[in-house]
């Protein structure tokens, strides 16, 4: 009996010693695996990467299974795995560089939402017109907007008050800038064509941190999301730096091809009321010109152009842009007339085929047509958007009253095709309410 008791005691003692030895080995391995204690999974991964991905987790300078006798052949010198502790490690997986699954592996990489940069220049009595344009941009756009508003000092307070009242929308930010021209020739630039109009020429030099920008005149109305014209930037080839629409579709009524006394782009010139720019490329490019054999950068070419052509230009900064792209046609992307639809496209009969087929995307009420009775179809759209508020019910009810007003204009050439004025607008309203609340 005593013999059996001794055997039992001896077995228990051996088992206890074996257990102690196992725990001590486990503690040592854990200390080595965390680089001496206190390590995190991120630190382990960093250590592994710092060691060139070669077994650095187990200790600095250790390279692969050769340094670990007894390690299975499946432990390659580049082995790395992640192990969920609720499951046993698979038999064919090397455990040398194996980490527990951790939350950091599943952390979401949230990409910052791209902002669309929109610039406008407002002087004189252009406050209300500009605010209506900005409202049309906000109502239908999807991505956030960043407004760059260049205005005379006396308009800043009014702009700030009106825009701050819209801050509840949280879909846009804005920055107000003074009107600034190069000091040496400020007076000459300011009186070119219309007050402050030539400010747009200097946007690439002023907004140095902005990569791309959509410039629009104050008399622009967006009938579909700004996102859509912004997406045209992706269609630029490697040489294109800006995009505009033709000045005319029909050469028989074109201005540049009949009256211009300076070079102009293409057959009928381009209109700069809607101008999409990759300003990074504009700042880098060296432009061909007819003043010197040396190519000039944007900031160096503007004043020489004005000095050479100031007696021959009629439309100011737009004429200078036409001259630039006459000499550098490969740098311009031309988009269809429906992106810059003006009275000239319908007052002599419809001559914008793209608008007839797909509707008007951007309405450009130049010639002051929003404020007189010469083109009542244009004025009807302007008044509808000016009086529209941001409440959902008001936007939903925008179309029917507008269509009734447009039907009263059928005695004019533009009114006869009034349906193209609401075709895209109706789609934009439908799309707005089809989007989820987070997208609005």
From Swiss-Prot:
One of its GO terms (molecular function) is UDP-xylosyltransferase activity. One of its GO terms (cellular component) is membrane. Pfam families: Glyco_transf_8. CDD domains: GT8_like_2. Its main location: membrane. Residues 1-6 are cytoplasmic. The chain crosses the membrane at residues 7-29. It is a single-pass type II membrane protein. Glycans are attached at residues 173, 237, 278. It catalyses: 3-O-(beta-D-glucosyl)-L-seryl-[EGF-like domain protein] + UDP-alpha-D-xylose = 3-O-[alpha-D-xylosyl-(1->3)-beta-D-glucosyl]-L-seryl-[EGF-like domain protein] + UDP + H(+). SUPFAM superfamilies: Nucleotide-diphospho-sugar transferases. It is found in: Membrane. InterPro entries: Glyco_trans_8, Glycosyltransferase_8, Nucleotide-diphossugar_trans. Glycosyltransferase which elongates the O-linked glucose attached to EGF-like repeats in the extracellular domain of Notch proteins by catalyzing the addition of xylose. Belongs to the glycosyltransferase 8 family. This is Glucoside xylosyltransferase 1. It comes from Homo sapiens (Human). The lineage of its organism: Eukaryota, Metazoa, Chordata, Craniata, Vertebrata.
């Amino acid at each position: 009996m005593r013999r059996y008791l001794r055997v039992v005691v001896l077995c228990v003692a051996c088992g206890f010693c074996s257990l102690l030895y196992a725990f001590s080995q486990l503690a040592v391995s854990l200390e080595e695996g965390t680089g001496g204690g206190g390590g995190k999974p991120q630190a382990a991964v960093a250590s592994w990467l710092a060691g060139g991905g070669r077994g650095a987790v187990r200790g600095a300078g250790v390279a692969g299974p050769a340094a670990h006798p007894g390690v299975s052949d499946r432990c390659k010198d580049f082995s790395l795995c992640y192990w969920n502790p609720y499951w046993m490690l698979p038999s064919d997986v090397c455990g040398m560089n194996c980490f527990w699954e951790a939350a950091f592996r599943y952390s979401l990489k949230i990409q910052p939402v791209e902002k669309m940069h929109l610039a406008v220049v407002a002087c004189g009595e252009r406050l209300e017109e500009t605010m209506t344009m900005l409202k049309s941009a906000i109502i239908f756009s999807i991505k956030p907007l960043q407004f760059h508003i260049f205005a005379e000092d006396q308009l800043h307070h009014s702009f700030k008050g009106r825009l701050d009242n819209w801050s509840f929308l949280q879909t846009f930010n804005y920055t107000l800038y003074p009107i600034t021209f190069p000091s040496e020739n400020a007076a000459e630039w300011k009186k070119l064509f219309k007050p402050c109009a030539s400010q747009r020429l200097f946007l690439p030099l002023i907004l140095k941190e902005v990569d791309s920008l959509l410039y629009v005149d104050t008399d622009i109305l967006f009938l579909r999301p700004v996102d859509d014209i912004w997406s045209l930037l992706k269609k630029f080839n490697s040489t294109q730096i800006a995009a505009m629409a033709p000045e005319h579709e029909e050469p028989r009524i074109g201005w540049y091809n009949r009256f211009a006394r300076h070079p102009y782009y293409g057959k009928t010139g381009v209109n700069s009321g809607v101008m999409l720019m990759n300003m990074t490329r504009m700042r880098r490019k060296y432009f061909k010109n007819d003043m010197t054999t040396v190519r000039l950068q944007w900031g160096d070419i503007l004043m020489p152009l004005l000095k050479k052509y100031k007696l021959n230009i009629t439309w100011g900064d737009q004429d200078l842009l036409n001259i630039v792209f006459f000499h550098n046609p490969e740098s311009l992307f031309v988009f269809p007339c429906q992106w810059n639809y003006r009275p000239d496209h319908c007052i002599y009969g419809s001559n914008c085929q793209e608008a007839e087929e797909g509707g008007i995307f951007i309405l450009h009420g130049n010639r002051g047509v929003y404020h007189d009775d010469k083109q009542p179809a244009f004025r009807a759209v302007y008044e509808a958007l000016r009086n529209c508020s941001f409440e959902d019910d008001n936007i939903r009810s925008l179309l029917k009253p507008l269509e009734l007003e447009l039907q009263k204009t059928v005695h004019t050439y533009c009114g006869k095709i009034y349906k193209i004025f609401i075709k895209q607008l109706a789609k934009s309203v439908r799309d707005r309410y089809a989007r989820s609340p987070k997208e609005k």
